Amino acid sequence: ILSALPGKASTVSAEIPYQTFRDFAENKGVFTPGVTGIEIKDNNGNAVGTLDVPMIDFSSVSRRGSLTLLSQGYGVSAKHGGLGDVNNASFGYDKNNYTVVKNNKHSGLDFSLHRFSKLITEAAPADINISGQLSDSSQYTAFYRAGAGTQYIKERSGKQTHIPGTFLTGGTVGTPWYSGNNLISSSPGDTYNKSQGPLASYGQMGDSGSPLFAYDSLSEKWSLAGVTLHNNGVNGQKKQLVVIT
């Protein structure tokens, strides 16, 4: 059973430049939306993996990482920890701020839908047209996330080092499994397991509401799979998300 610790930011590999995870979440450098075959290199410049699917456009993710744009006027997040009562959110490289005029909190699930005072034009809304089972690795061939807050880098020994500052970072997540009640779980805290991809990213305390995106190899599109709810501790491996449909 996962503990009720809200996720915040992420734990990532200490063997890959930290800037790589920041560039990934902000679509900077080689991480241009639509580009395929992006080679990931470690601190010594050695190739450690390749991102084979078209790079996602993360512009739908708010600068704080806890809200994702679903249309030009609405965004989705978790409900707990005050996320169901947000007043504003910012998007884009210019960090333009938008006022939330209505918060709609789901009565039974831990997620919330927010309406903005005006249309947001500098960000591309996420798709939520999920078909089939997210656990079907033949259809959903990649999972990416982004979030912001307290950061850690993790060595193979398990030692974690805190990185000061607040940054939007992102990375890869292994194929999730269903855990009941519209929930899915994954194990991106198993940082050096190849099943988590070359840029494994594990949400930490405060990252609640941050998105998980799934790449559908049949439709060749990225969709919002769910938003982060909890993890099983700073040194844990698993996290839990609510599926957005």
Predicted regions and their residues:
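Sec-dependent N-terminal signal peptides
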Residues: 1-3
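C-terminal subregion of chymotrypsin/trypsin-like serine protease catalytic domains
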Residues: 5-47, 57, 63-82, 167-197, ...
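Short, solvent-exposed loop/turn elements at domain surfaces
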Residues: 30, 78, 84-87, 123, ...
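Cell wall/extracellular polymer interaction/catalysis modules
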Residues: 59-61, 101-102, 112-116
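Catalytic-histidine neighborhood of serine endopeptidases
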Residues: 71-72, 76-109
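Short conserved beta-strand and strand-loop elements enriched in small hydrophobics
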Residues: 83-96, 139-148, 214
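Chymotrypsin/trypsin-fold serine protease catalytic domain
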Residues: 108-206, 228-233
